[in-house]
């Protein structure tokens, strides 16, 4: 089936997004000290590379990642924590899924790809354990206790 230029461009955008996310996850995995979290991020990266290869079957093009996006999410993840960075990145991907409807007629297996990607990545992201988040939760609870004590003293 011959793809229109508009559909082909959308597929190239999807493909570029997958290879960019692959590099983001790989970069984060290398920078994380916890072996279990690094392993999970490596697994997500390999999934993204597989999705890139799936899109490449239709576009027949090798694409380079968006280096600016890699650095942006890497820095966000280093400053605010990798869990925050990953969830921010994945929230952007949810809006891209609306565009999948426009190419559904050309790519019959797209529904399976979306389902697999959502289930697998969400399961893996939920497994991530970040010490910084646990610490932040303790700080919030401590501040809450202090506020209760302060209002009780008044």
Model-found features: residue ranges?
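Non-heme di-metal
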Residues: 1-142, 147-152
